[in-house]
């Protein structure tokens, strides 16, 4: 299994902590089951340094495991932000070259 970081981009005017929002996130995390290795945390404030293009502010992160990038993307599609004007960035975590750890 590979490890992936999910970074969330919140929809405009998203309000953190509403009962409906909490229920949607809980349901999504429950549906991913053992794939979730670190549920992560929301981000209260963020900014970018350098040229990051025109992206929404960072809304939070999680860490999951999946067989490959396609499976990780399939899991990410259930994120409550998807379809509401927000989104998820999916990236595979790897050990740096020369770290001595197997990739």
Where are the regions that the model predicts?
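Conserved, structured core segments of small domains
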Residues: 1-103
């Amino acid at each position: 299994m590979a490890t992936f970081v999910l970074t969330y981009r919140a929809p405009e005017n998203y309000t953190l902590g509403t009962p409906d929002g909490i229920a949607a996130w809980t349901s999504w995390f429950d549906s991913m089951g053992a794939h979730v290795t670190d549920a992560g945390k929301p981000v209260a404030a963020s900014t970018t340094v350098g040229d990051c293009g025109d992206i929404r502010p960072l809304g939070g992160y999680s860490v999951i495991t999946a067989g490959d990038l396609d499976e990780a993307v399939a899991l990410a599609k259930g994120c409550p932000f998807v379809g509401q004007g927000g989104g998820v960035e999916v990236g595979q975590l790897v050990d740096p070259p020369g770290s001595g750890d197997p990739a």
